[in-house]
């Protein structure tokens, strides 16, 4: 007999669709349940106050989980976009490095040097290297105008 009473107390009634609808409506207006509202809802829905309080607590937990999932999806898509942008930029950098190497080799051939131009000489503005830089700029302009440069090349 004692066993059948404890089973009866532990068995919970499911909420009706109307009760759930009213609880949902109230939840959209107030995420936290004030004692007065809890009493009012309890009387209005014919539910124990504790059941109303637990429903709100569970709903807040589900709401937070859903919000975190939405945030996660948003962050994940932003991360994927950033990775895609990074890959495109790396491709552009590689292309520009290759183009610079070709231009330096062309300059080396143009100035009848045996080896490619030393990087440190090209960036210098010393009087000794001014002529070489001017020649490099002219050669690069020629290189670009012949359709080998970035002006006619797509980055895709």
Swiss-Prot record:
Gene3D superfamilies: Homeodomain-like. Its main location: nucleus. It is found in: Nucleus. GO terms for biological process: response to absence of light; response to blue light. GO terms for molecular function: DNA-binding transcription factor activity; DNA-binding transcription factor activity, RNA polymerase II-specific; transcription cis-regulatory region binding. Keywords: DNA-binding, Homeobox, Nucleus, Transcription, Transcription regulation. This is Homeobox-leucine zipper protein ATHB-52. It comes from Arabidopsis thaliana (Mouse-ear cress). The lineage of its organism: Eukaryota, Viridiplantae, Streptophyta, Embryophyta, Tracheophyta.
